[in-house]
Amino acid sequence: MRVSDFYFDLPDELIARYPKPDRTASRLLQLNGENGEITHRTFADILDQIHEGDLLIFNNTRVIPARMFGRKASGGKVEVLVERILSDTRFLAHVRSSKAPKEGAELWLGEDKLGEHHGVKMIMVARHDTLFELEIAQKQTALLDVLQQIGHMPLPPYIDRPDEEADKERYQTVYNKVPGAVAAPTAGLHFDDALLAQLKAKGVNFAFVTLHVGAGTFQPVRVEQIEDHKMHAEYVEVPQEVCDAIIATKQAGKRVIAVGTTSVRSVESAALATEEKGEHALITPYFSDTSIFIYPGKTFRVVDCLITNFHLPESTLIMLVSAFAGYRHTMQAYQSAVENRYRFFSYGDAMFISKNPHVNGLD
């Protein structure tokens, strides 16, 4: 399959640069994956689509204020985006500057917030392909504390504006728990505490995985044939209680509903690893990196329904949705969303999709 198969025209004005005032006020396009039927709703209506005994899988990662601005020892400007925390004081990062810093180079970050000559000193330890390993010079200073002081929320490039104070709350799910992501699991942004309480009262079950979303999620697919694409690695935790909840839900004849593509990739990674180990369970605990790439023709072992935002043209995420709902149904749904002026991407509207049991490639 070609990357261009997943292209669609998107008017710039449909890219949401700010969230709706209320989380549940977003629109919801419901797609029946089996027959392609489309229904237009609001996100609050999802309460009627999720039933007693169904299991919602949430990603409880917390977005860290991962973007820092500063200068090199030479005085040149530098921008640093944390990709992965390695220890309290070391991390991997993307670095933007006129010249890439060399091993041993000093960076002074956060002067935009702390004042000139009051930045936090970082040392460039090593380079790993496109990523730089940096260390805080003051060993007793923890990275997460530094980021709270000087970091900016890492809004996606297509939002195309500086971060604002409100983004600290709105570019974060209400159930976030484990710090480490540099991009939000955006399907979860539509849930507020009241909706979660209503779902609980209805008898809907919750389970929480952790996938720390990396900046690689915004990288374009640079090959012509999608099968040649190599996914970036992200760290995943699928604990025993999640596996138990999934198995119990399946045994009861209820649905496993993934909130977001990161939840899909988490549980499907765990199920695939279980199968590859030859174990006789559907899914077993998983604490490791995943580079799983789900595109049309791939098998879903766990997930029955998917809640997700609208994704970029030619992205790995629209490929995942096409694998789940069927290519033709997915592209028709996206065309309908554009025609009906849905809002796209991280701060945009959502879809509720049931799995197409008949998909295989470009159906």
From Swiss-Prot:
Its EC number is 2.4.99.17. GO terms for molecular function: S-adenosylmethionine:tRNA ribosyltransferase-isomerase activity. It comes from the Bacteria. Keywords: Cytoplasm, Queuosine biosynthesis, S-adenosyl-L-methionine, Transferase. The keyword S-adenosyl-L-methionine applies. It catalyses: 7-aminomethyl-7-carbaguanosine(34) in tRNA + S-adenosyl-L-methionine = epoxyqueuosine(34) in tRNA + adenine + L-methionine + 2 H(+). GO terms for cellular component: cytoplasm. Its main location: cytoplasm. Pfam families: Queuosine_synth. The keyword Ribonucleoprotein does not apply. InterPro entries: QueA, QueA_dom1, QueA_dom2, QueA_sf. This is S-adenosylmethionine:tRNA ribosyltransferase-isomerase.
